[in-house]
Curated annotation (Swiss-Prot):
Pathways per UniProt: Amino-acid degradation; D-alanine degradation; NH(3) and pyruvate from D-alanine: step 1/1
Source species of the chain: Delftia acidovorans (strain DSM 14801 / SPH-1)
Enzyme Commission number, as recorded: 1.4.99.-
SUPFAM superfamilies, per database record: FAD-linked reductases, C-terminal domain, FAD/NAD(P)-binding domain
Cofactor requirements of the protein: FAD
Name the UniProt record assigns to this protein: D-amino acid dehydrogenase
Length: 432
């Protein structure tokens, strides 16, 4: 079976790896000159299933209004002139009820927890190295109100049997010693000891190398001009004036998936949400984090790699604008200097990327109404967290294996209310 995977980020490469492991003949196409050159290039570095939480949550609409008035707000909305942006935001607002939040969080955690186990198995199978750490993640609260509000998430963690620890301000430094200098500015924290961290860019490049050893062909500098449809199937992909054909196709273009599939009449509710990061050379290890720390006030993650600190976060809804905003750099510098002043911020590299976000936070994984076209996109801020599980799921669906977890509520038909065409069996639409 020949499979074309469109996209060479962490989602596309993990899909290719698992497909090759299942016996498929796989080719990966990407417009860049190397794997993980866009959204997977410099993300926050956390693999955090326990924090797989929908942005669409009770209270978020009011918080969003308040954030718009703040200098260092975690969210910014700039109208891009498209009807799709307005429709996407309306869909997100409809998912802000307690009922929808619970449904969406369960779906996200299902994929994320499975993905962690897949990553651990992949690591055991391949010995892959990507500056990984298994020290858990720590969410920091600066106010009592934030600490009180975490009860909603704690209830879900209990329900899903996810280990956690609630810490007071004196216990924070026992987990992250460098926080001792910030003790008086903090109230407490929520620690998930099973979470991990690692360099997504390095992981993707290493896995791409491993995948080539399994026969995967990686083709870069490939500009996809469009997909060709014949008789309810994809007949090929036009790339640099050439028609490439396969038996199955996987769309893993991230934020650009919608544009690629719109001519086919597929309406993907995937919007580009812009995020930023700083990669800071490590100066004083005693004033650096041991793993990942999440600042609840600014919605920013600070992650330790071997000799670097990665500071990432924020969300801008403004289309496909990739300009670097110096105000966002100032916010990232503010947080890392306040919590972990052990890096050389003056020599930090500043980066931005577009996360492919769905209104309900859940990725879109599965079949479409075109019998040989599959989707693996819409992972938002959790592409690294969900990559291995998503890649394994899509490989199982394509090769006819029974997935190890339920795929309920993951396919595109939760938005279209129209069943996808499976190569074998049927699908029941799930409302979103």
């Amino acid at each position: 079976m020949k499979v074309l995977v469109l996209g060479g980020g962490v989602i596309g490469v993990t899909s290719a790896y698992y497909l090759a492991r299942a016996g498929a003949e796989v080719t990966v196409l990407d417009r860049q000159d190397a794997p993980a050159s866009e959204t997977s290039f410099a993300n926050a570095g956390q693999v955090s299933p326990g924090y797989s939480t929908p942005w669409a949550a009770p209270g978020i609409p009011l918080k969003a209004l308040k954030w718009m008035l703040q200098e260092h707000a975690p969210l910014a909305v700039r109208l891009d002139g498209s009807l799709f942006q307005l429709r996407w935001m309306a869909q997100m607002l409809r998912n802000c009820s307690a009922q929808r939040y619970a449904v969406n969080k369960e779906r996200m955690m299902r994929v994320a927890e499975y993905s962690r186990s897949c990553l651990q198995q992949l690591r055991a199978d391949t010995g892959i190295a990507y500056e990984q750490r298994t020290g858990g993640t720590l969410q920091l609260f600066r106010t009592q109100a934030q600490l009180d509000a975490v009860e909603r998430d704690v209830a879900v963690l209990r329900e899903c049997a996810v280990p956690f620890e609630l810490l007071d301000r004196d216990q924070l430094a026992q987990v992250e010693p460098a926080l001792a200098q910030a003790r008086d500015r903090l109230t407490g924290g929520l620690r998930l000891p099973k979470d991990e961290t690692g360099d997504c860019h390095r992981f993707t490049n290493e896995l791409a190398r491993i995948a080539t050893g399994l026969g995967v062909e990686l083709r870069f500098n490939q500009n996809v001009d469009g997909l060709v449809v014949e008789g309810g199937r994809i007949a090929g992909v036009r790339v640099n004036g050439e028609l490439l054909t396969a038996d199955r196709y996987v769309m893993a273009f991230g934020s650009y998936s919608r544009q690629a599939l719109e001519p086919l009449g597929l309406d993907l509710p995937v919007y580009p949400v812009k995020g930023y990061s700083l990669t800071v050379p490590l100066g004083n290890p005693a004033l650096a984090p041991q793993s990942t720390v999440l600042d609840e006030t600014y919605k920013i993650a600070v992650t330790r790699f071997d000799d670097r600190i990665r500071v990432g976060g924020m969300a801008e809804l403004g289309g496909f604008d990739l300009r670097l905003d110096p105000r966002r750099r100032a916010t990232l510098e503010l947080v890392v200097n306040d919590l972990f002043p052990g890096g050389d911020v003056a020599r930090a590299s500043f980066w931005t990327g577009l996360r492919p976000m769905t209104p309900d936070g859940t990725p879109i994984i599965g079949a479409t109404r075109y019998a040989n076209l599959f989707l693996n996109t819409g992972h938002g801020t959790l592409g690294w967290t969900m990559a291995c599980g998503s890649g394994r799921l899509i490989a199982d669906l394509i090769t006819g294996r029974s997935p190890e977890i339920s795929t309920d509520g993951l396919a595109l038909d939760r938005y279209t209310h129209r069943p996808a065409r499976h190569l074998g069996g049927s699908s029941t639409p799930v409302s979103a």
